Regions:
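Sec-dependent signal peptide cleavage junction
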Residues: 18-54, 69
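Short, well-structured alpha-helical segments in soluble
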Residues: 118-134, 246-255
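Bacterial Sec-dependent N-terminal signal peptides
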Residues: 1-27, 159, 205, 414-418
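Extracytoplasmic ligand/sensor domains, especially the bilobed periplasmic-binding protein
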Residues: 137-139, 144-206, 210-220, 298
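Extracellular/periplasmic periplasmic-binding protein-like sensory domains
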Residues: 274-345
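Periplasmic-binding protein-like
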Residues: 131-141, 159-162, 202-208, 255-273, ...
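Segments of small-molecule ligand-sensing domains
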Residues: 336-340, 354-417
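Signal peptide-proximal N-terminal region
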Residues: 77-109
Length: 418
């Protein structure tokens, strides 16, 4: 079955209301009707649910966009790409719930479509069926993130933001957890990576004009001023939109390796920079240090040949891991396809933080004391630390995953993970 058919089948099942509610400690999934409502047991306090703990998972399924009022699929044989991330995340969620069910985990899980026209996020968060929720997991956009963070703070329950790499202006909220590390954290990590591995090499940051690029430069400048180690001497070079290799070589040294930081999140800029540096790598040896968005770039293309590239990511799926192999085999056997990164993200976040909730016992205790527990690791070595934006008053603003993996590639092949 091709991926399109697989997702279409999943959409049909979701539109029929299947598995949007799950009592994980039972032997079956509760089948829902086409109204996609939640179970009446959600109105009861946790004690009435025989000790089960209530989890709310928010993700963009776009069911109302994909199906009309009669549950007819709107896109014929096509499958719009904007639906993929939410459905892939949902697949991982379902696999995690299967694993938790096998462990007899006492959970009461509710899944909400953040793109629902009849049940918007704000309405869900204030609804009777949301009452008693002890953990929020969300694949979100900024507006939704702020709503969920606000409710989490009011109810003293943790909210795990699994995808959005920004605090969205949220402060003074110890219930808010960012898993996808912020841009500043990536800059700090890349800076330390260069300090640790290339302390004597010349460093050049190539950038283009732009507000985002100014922010990146400000981060590196601030890190240079506050580092406890010997600061890097970064040379900043602003390039025109139509630059080529000749605009770069004057900043390179033919007698030693130059560390070239790509000071922009623009993927087109990244491709142009890598291609230009690759075209002169017989004369100028360089290591290109890129941004977290580079995971989406195909570096196997011939124009990048021979160029060493390093970029940071907070999520790394080790292909040698037994659970990873098991999930890959499941997808190969059942769907004739490979699981995406979002499948692993869905599995990891739901399994890990549900286990932490069960370990703590819920009841408004939060997860703060167990966020760093290594025994709950699934794929990623999360390093979830408190963030204090104002060091003068030391108010805890939120928690953030500070663990970064540094992926080194040559000709598109991973040659090292640090």
């Amino acid at each position: 079955m091709k991926a399109t058919s697989r997702y279409l089948l999943l959409c049909i099942l979701l539109a029929a209301g299947t598995t949007l509610y799950a009592q994980v400690d039972t032997t079956h999934r509760t089948q829902r009707d086409t109204t996609r409502s939640v179970s009446d047991t959600s109105l009861l306090p946790v004690d009435s649910l025989n000790g089960r703990h209530k989890v709310a998972i928010f993700l963009p399924l776009y069911l109302d966009s994909a199906f009309d009022a009669s549950n007819n699929y709107r896109y014929d044989k096509n499958f719009p790409k904007f639906i993929n991330p939410g459905l892939e995340f949902y697949e991982g969620v379902q696999l995690a719930l299967d694993s938790l069910q096998k462990e007899n985990a006492r959970l009461d899980v509710h899944i909400y479509d953040t793109r629902s026209a009849t049940q918007p996020v704000a309405q869900v968060l204030q609804s009777p069926e949301f009452k008693g929720t002890e953990l929020i997991i969300g694949h979100v956009v900024p507006g939704e993130m702020q709503q969920m963070a606000s409710v989490a703070a009011q109810l003293n329950i943790p909210f795990i933001n699994v995808n959005f790499p920004n605090d969205g202006g949220i402060t003074n909220n110890p219930e808010f957890v960012i898993l996808n590390s912020t841009l500043r954290t990536h800059c700090e990590g890349l800076y330390r990576f260069i300090q640790r591995n290339y302390p004597t090499k010349p460093v050049v940051l190539f950038r283009k004009k732009g507000t985002q690029e100014d922010r990146l430069k400000a981060y590196f400048d601030d890190i240079t001023k506050t580092t406890n180690s010997v600061p890097l001497k970064i040379k900043y070079v602003t390039l025109d939109d139509a630059f080529d290799a000749t605009a770069l070589t004057s900043s390179l040294d033919s007698s030693t390796q130059t560390i070239c930081i790509a000071g922009s999140l623009d993927e087109n800029f990244a491709r142009m920079l890598c291609q230009s540096l690759a075209s002169v790598n017989q004369t100028y040896t360089t290591l290109i240090v890129g941004m977290p968005t580079w995971d989406n770039i195909d570096f196997t293309r011939p124009e990048f040949k021979g160029e060493e590239i390093v970029y940071s990511t907070p999520f790394y799926i080790n292909p040698a891991d037994n659970l990873v192999k098991s999930i890959q085999q499941y997808f190969k056997t059942k769907f004739y396809s490979r699981p995406s990164d979002m499948v692993y993200r869905g599995y990891e976040t739901v399994y890990r933080f549900s286990k932490q909730l069960l370990h703590i016992g819920g009841g408004g205790k939060g997860l703060n004391g167990s966020l760093g527990e290594k025994k709950f690791k699934v794929f990623t070595d999360f390093d979830i630390e408190p963030v204090f934006l104002n060091r003068q008053n030391m108010t805890l603003d939120y928690f953030e995953n500070k663990k970064l993996y540094f992926i080194k590639k040559l000709d598109g092949n991973v040659t090292g993970v640090y």
